[in-house]
Amino acid sequence: MSKWSDIKMYDLTIPIGICTPAWPTYEPLQMKFFKRLTPNGANGQLMTHSNHVGTHLDGPMHFDTAGRDVASLELTKLCAPGVVVDLSDQAEDFGIYTPQDIERRVTVKEGDVLIINTGYHIYGWDSPTADERRYMLRHPGPSLDFIQWVRDKKIRWIGVDCGSADHPMNTKIRDWEPMEATACDKLFQKKYGKTLNEVY
Protein backbone atom coordinates (compact mmCIF):
# COMPACT_ATOMS: atom_id res chain seq x y z
CA MET A 1 0.00 0.00 0.00
CA SER A 2 1.15 3.57 -0.71
CA LYS A 3 2.04 6.12 1.91
CA TRP A 4 -1.04 7.79 3.43
CA SER A 5 0.02 11.09 1.85
CA ASP A 6 -0.38 9.49 -1.58
CA ILE A 7 -3.93 8.30 -0.91
CA LYS A 8 -7.00 10.39 -1.67
CA MET A 9 -9.65 10.00 1.04
CA TYR A 10 -13.40 10.31 0.48
CA ASP A 11 -16.10 10.80 3.09
CA LEU A 12 -18.92 8.47 2.04
CA THR A 13 -21.07 8.92 5.13
CA ILE A 14 -24.64 10.12 5.03
CA PRO A 15 -25.20 12.93 7.55
CA ILE A 16 -26.63 11.57 10.78
CA GLY A 17 -29.33 13.25 12.81
CA ILE A 18 -32.78 12.70 14.22
CA CYS A 19 -34.20 12.55 10.68
CA THR A 20 -31.82 9.81 9.49
CA PRO A 21 -34.01 6.78 8.79
CA ALA A 22 -33.28 3.58 10.68
CA TRP A 23 -33.70 0.14 9.17
CA PRO A 24 -37.46 -0.56 9.09
CA THR A 25 -38.77 -1.66 12.54
CA TYR A 26 -35.49 -0.60 14.22
CA GLU A 27 -35.22 2.11 16.86
CA PRO A 28 -34.54 5.52 15.28
CA LEU A 29 -31.85 7.90 16.50
CA GLN A 30 -32.75 10.00 19.53
CA MET A 31 -30.70 12.88 20.90
CA LYS A 32 -31.08 15.10 23.94
CA PHE A 33 -29.00 17.57 25.92
CA PHE A 34 -28.20 16.54 29.50
CA LYS A 35 -25.88 19.53 30.08
CA ARG A 36 -25.95 23.07 28.70
CA LEU A 37 -23.36 25.84 28.64
CA THR A 38 -25.59 27.66 31.09
CA PRO A 39 -25.50 26.61 33.94
CA ASN A 40 -23.09 23.67 33.44
CA GLY A 41 -20.24 25.37 31.58
CA ALA A 42 -20.29 22.82 28.74
CA ASN A 43 -22.76 21.18 26.42
CA GLY A 44 -23.33 17.45 26.76
CA GLN A 45 -25.60 15.29 24.66
CA LEU A 46 -26.94 11.79 24.98
CA MET A 47 -27.49 9.92 21.74
CA THR A 48 -29.09 6.49 21.37
CA HIS A 49 -29.81 4.50 18.24
CA SER A 50 -29.96 1.00 16.88
CA ASN A 51 -27.07 -0.44 14.90
CA HIS A 52 -28.75 0.21 11.54
CA VAL A 53 -28.86 4.00 11.43
CA GLY A 54 -26.82 5.96 8.93
CA THR A 55 -23.57 4.80 7.38
CA HIS A 56 -22.34 1.71 9.18
CA LEU A 57 -20.53 -1.59 8.81
CA ASP A 58 -22.15 -4.89 9.72
CA GLY A 59 -19.77 -7.22 11.51
CA PRO A 60 -19.94 -10.99 10.95
CA MET A 61 -21.84 -11.35 14.24
CA HIS A 62 -24.81 -9.55 12.65
CA PHE A 63 -25.74 -12.80 10.91
CA ASP A 64 -23.61 -15.37 12.76
CA THR A 65 -23.81 -16.10 16.50
CA ALA A 66 -20.13 -17.09 16.51
CA GLY A 67 -19.14 -14.14 14.28
CA ARG A 68 -16.91 -11.28 15.38
CA ASP A 69 -18.21 -7.83 16.20
CA VAL A 70 -17.10 -4.75 14.28
CA ALA A 71 -14.67 -3.67 17.03
CA SER A 72 -12.67 -6.88 16.60
CA LEU A 73 -12.14 -6.45 12.84
CA GLU A 74 -8.57 -5.48 11.98
CA LEU A 75 -8.30 -2.06 10.36
CA THR A 76 -5.74 -3.49 7.94
CA LYS A 77 -8.53 -5.71 6.56
CA LEU A 78 -10.79 -2.69 6.08
CA CYS A 79 -8.20 -0.44 4.41
CA ALA A 80 -7.47 -1.72 0.94
CA PRO A 81 -7.46 -0.73 -2.71
CA GLY A 82 -10.92 -0.45 -4.12
CA VAL A 83 -13.09 0.37 -7.04
CA VAL A 84 -16.25 2.41 -7.49
CA VAL A 85 -18.80 1.18 -10.00
CA ASP A 86 -21.48 3.56 -11.25
CA LEU A 87 -24.70 1.67 -11.98
CA SER A 88 -26.93 4.74 -11.67
CA ASP A 89 -27.82 4.75 -15.37
CA GLN A 90 -29.48 1.33 -15.05
CA ALA A 91 -30.91 1.80 -11.56
CA GLU A 92 -34.66 1.65 -11.08
CA ASP A 93 -37.06 0.83 -8.28
CA PHE A 94 -36.54 -2.84 -7.34
CA GLY A 95 -33.84 -3.15 -10.04
CA ILE A 96 -31.39 -6.04 -10.02
CA TYR A 97 -27.69 -5.75 -10.79
CA THR A 98 -25.41 -8.70 -11.47
CA PRO A 99 -21.68 -9.44 -11.29
CA GLN A 100 -21.67 -9.10 -15.08
CA ASP A 101 -23.13 -5.57 -14.84
CA ILE A 102 -20.24 -4.63 -12.55
CA GLU A 103 -17.49 -6.34 -14.55
CA ARG A 104 -18.67 -4.69 -17.78
CA ARG A 105 -17.91 -1.31 -16.21
CA VAL A 106 -14.89 -1.77 -13.94
CA THR A 107 -12.10 -4.21 -13.23
CA VAL A 108 -12.58 -5.76 -9.80
CA LYS A 109 -9.42 -7.40 -8.48
CA GLU A 110 -9.21 -10.07 -5.82
CA GLY A 111 -9.28 -8.50 -2.36
CA ASP A 112 -10.69 -5.15 -3.50
CA VAL A 113 -13.18 -2.99 -1.65
CA LEU A 114 -16.25 -2.51 -3.84
CA ILE A 115 -18.35 0.66 -3.70
CA ILE A 116 -21.59 0.52 -5.70
CA ASN A 117 -23.19 3.77 -6.82
CA THR A 118 -26.81 2.89 -7.52
CA GLY A 119 -27.76 6.56 -7.74
CA TYR A 120 -30.26 6.11 -4.92
CA HIS A 121 -28.32 8.47 -2.64
CA ILE A 122 -30.48 11.17 -4.26
CA TYR A 123 -33.36 9.81 -2.17
CA GLY A 124 -31.43 10.06 1.11
CA TRP A 125 -33.09 12.06 3.89
CA ASP A 126 -30.75 15.05 3.48
CA SER A 127 -31.31 15.42 -0.28
CA PRO A 128 -33.70 17.89 -1.98
CA THR A 129 -35.19 14.83 -3.74
CA ALA A 130 -35.53 12.84 -0.50
CA ASP A 131 -37.89 9.86 -0.64
CA GLU A 132 -37.46 7.56 2.34
CA ARG A 133 -39.56 4.75 0.86
CA ARG A 134 -37.50 4.62 -2.33
CA TYR A 135 -34.21 4.91 -0.41
CA MET A 136 -35.04 2.15 2.10
CA LEU A 137 -37.66 -0.07 0.41
CA ARG A 138 -37.28 0.16 -3.39
CA HIS A 139 -33.57 0.59 -4.07
CA PRO A 140 -31.80 -1.76 -6.51
CA GLY A 141 -29.97 -4.79 -5.18
CA PRO A 142 -27.83 -7.71 -6.31
CA SER A 143 -28.83 -10.94 -8.00
CA LEU A 144 -28.58 -14.16 -6.01
CA ASP A 145 -25.32 -15.18 -7.72
CA PHE A 146 -23.70 -11.95 -6.50
CA ILE A 147 -22.73 -13.39 -3.09
CA GLN A 148 -20.77 -16.26 -4.62
CA TRP A 149 -19.02 -13.80 -6.95
CA VAL A 150 -18.10 -11.66 -3.91
CA ARG A 151 -16.70 -14.73 -2.15
CA ASP A 152 -14.76 -15.85 -5.22
CA LYS A 153 -13.28 -12.36 -5.60
CA LYS A 154 -12.53 -12.18 -1.85
CA ILE A 155 -14.08 -8.71 -1.75
CA ARG A 156 -13.06 -7.08 1.56
CA TRP A 157 -16.28 -5.17 2.00
CA ILE A 158 -19.06 -3.61 -0.04
CA GLY A 159 -20.45 -0.11 0.24
CA VAL A 160 -23.69 1.14 -1.29
CA ASP A 161 -25.46 4.50 -1.48
CA CYS A 162 -28.89 3.23 -0.46
CA GLY A 163 -30.71 1.51 2.41
CA SER A 164 -28.95 -1.86 2.17
CA ALA A 165 -26.36 -3.82 0.21
CA ASP A 166 -29.04 -6.48 -0.31
CA HIS A 167 -32.11 -6.23 -2.50
CA PRO A 168 -34.98 -5.02 -0.29
CA MET A 169 -37.17 -7.92 -1.43
CA ASN A 170 -34.47 -10.38 -0.38
CA THR A 171 -34.83 -9.15 3.22
CA LYS A 172 -37.57 -9.05 5.87
CA ILE A 173 -38.88 -5.88 4.21
CA ARG A 174 -40.72 -8.21 1.86
CA ASP A 175 -42.83 -9.48 4.80
CA TRP A 176 -43.13 -6.12 6.56
CA GLU A 177 -44.23 -4.23 3.43
CA PRO A 178 -46.62 -6.49 1.46
CA MET A 179 -47.74 -3.66 -0.87
CA GLU A 180 -44.11 -3.08 -1.89
CA ALA A 181 -43.66 -6.83 -2.42
CA THR A 182 -46.75 -6.90 -4.67
CA ALA A 183 -45.42 -3.97 -6.72
CA CYS A 184 -42.04 -5.70 -7.05
CA ASP A 185 -43.69 -8.99 -8.04
CA LYS A 186 -45.58 -7.24 -10.86
CA LEU A 187 -42.39 -5.55 -12.08
CA PHE A 188 -40.43 -8.83 -12.04
CA GLN A 189 -43.14 -10.67 -13.97
CA LYS A 190 -43.23 -7.93 -16.60
CA LYS A 191 -39.46 -7.44 -16.87
CA TYR A 192 -38.06 -10.94 -16.22
CA GLY A 193 -41.05 -13.23 -16.76
CA LYS A 194 -40.57 -14.52 -13.20
CA THR A 195 -42.37 -13.97 -9.92
CA LEU A 196 -40.72 -12.42 -6.89
CA ASN A 197 -40.63 -15.88 -5.29
CA GLU A 198 -38.80 -17.27 -8.33
CA VAL A 199 -36.21 -14.48 -8.29
CA TYR A 200 -35.61 -14.40 -4.50
Language model segments and positions:
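Active-/binding-site microenvironments in catalytic and ligand-binding cores
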Residues: 1-200
